[in-house]
Amino acid sequence: MGFNEIVDFFYRLAEAGDKLREEGVWLAYGPEKLPEALEKPVNGTVAVKLGFPIYQKGGVVMDVTNVEQAGIAEDAGAVAVMVLDKLPYDVRKAGGVARMADVKVIEQVMSSITIPVMAKVRIGHYYEAMILESIGVDMIDESEVLTPVDEKHHINKWLFKVPFVNGARSLAEALRRIAEGASMIRTKGEAGTGNVAEAVRHMKLIMGDIWRLRGLSAEERLRVAREYGVPHQLVDLTARLGRLPVVNFAAGGIATPADAALMMWLGADGVFVGSGIFKSSDPSERAAAIVLATSMWDDPEAVAEAQRMVSEAKSMMGIDIRKLSPEELLQVRGAEA
């Protein structure tokens, strides 16, 4: 499996969508019998690795550190949980080296809930990823929240059957991660701060770059591909689709229902919420409220109802990003790659 397959997969999807729109056809239901290739999905194929994140669209993935938190997330309506050793806020406060969560904890979470379970690995740490794949997690996050083992090289995700999610601050970073095999992108934001400002900035940068890309000529897109260090087919595909060719979630500092709705309004396909839920004093109510606001983001009345479900007095204590030193910023980790 390689990059050409991901391009072919999305071009065929785009062509099918174009044809249906031209013919005025709306697919309300599928055939009684699916083609054999679709009836028996093969683990590790492009269709499975790219298809799994699509089922998370419109939902919330919640960071958890134990079985109890995973149960709260599932009851609140999360589409998946992300298991890690410490919440990003605690990682920031503790300092030192942040590593993959205990395998036993991940397995306990997997056996206690029915929704998908994701887990984080350090940037460039192939063997943490191989361990997670071997125990059967549904997705791996190669995350800057943990301490990178390689600042210049991310994991070659084409070597794995399990899908990966990576963070990005710009279109260039997002396309480089996709070229490496990422099946999902998330804005980096500034995790563990309870401040959504950086997530907003990163989402606007990515969406703005895509908008400008659509107005470029073929020669100009080739120049952009060289500048980004990615295959020109990926740049062309992104321009044609008018969006990233993989699912794009927002993350980093989301702490309230209004934060989640804002990120969806800016173009996110869903949201990751880390410290915002379980560092608050009302985690159960906040989790349910953020799920409601994310799924009903285009209805201000529904988002207002979600906001009524929480109290600002119980929100996590946020961190002013402007007061962080360059060494304290998590978003810059792995940025050289």
From Swiss-Prot:
Catalytic activity reported: aldehydo-D-ribose 5-phosphate + D-glyceraldehyde 3-phosphate + L-glutamine = pyridoxal 5'-phosphate + L-glutamate + phosphate + 3 H2O + H(+)
Keyword field contains Ion transport: no
UniProt feature coiled coil, ranges: none
Origin species: Aeropyrum pernix (strain ATCC 700893 / DSM 11879 / JCM 9820 / NBRC 100138 / K1)
Protein name: Pyridoxal 5'-phosphate synthase subunit PdxS
Chain residues that bind D-ribose 5-phosphate: D63, G192, G253, G274, S275
Enzyme class of the recorded protein, top EC level: lyase
Presence of keyword Ribonucleoprotein: no
Biochemical pathway: Cofactor biosynthesis; pyridoxal 5'-phosphate biosynthesis
Active site residues per record: K120
Molecular function GO labels: pyridoxal 5'-phosphate synthase (glutamine hydrolysing) activity
HAMAP family referenced in this protein's UniProt entry, alphabetically: PdxS
UniProt keyword list: Lyase, Pyridoxal phosphate, Schiff base
Sequence similarity: Belongs to the PdxS/SNZ family.
A biological process term (GO) from this entry: pyridoxal phosphate biosynthetic process
Subunit structure: In the presence of PdxT, forms a dodecamer of heterodimers.
Top-rank lineage group of the source organism: Archaea
PROSITE patterns (UniProt xref): PDXS_SNZ_1, PDXS_SNZ_2
Function per UniProt: Catalyzes the formation of pyridoxal 5'-phosphate from ribose 5-phosphate (RBP), glyceraldehyde 3-phosphate (G3P) and ammonia. The ammonia is provided by the PdxT subunit. Can also use ribulose 5-phosphate and dihydroxyacetone phosphate as substrates, resulting from enzyme-catalyzed isomerization of RBP and G3P, respectively.
Gene3D superfamilies: Aldolase class I
List of residues binding D-glyceraldehyde 3-phosphate: K204
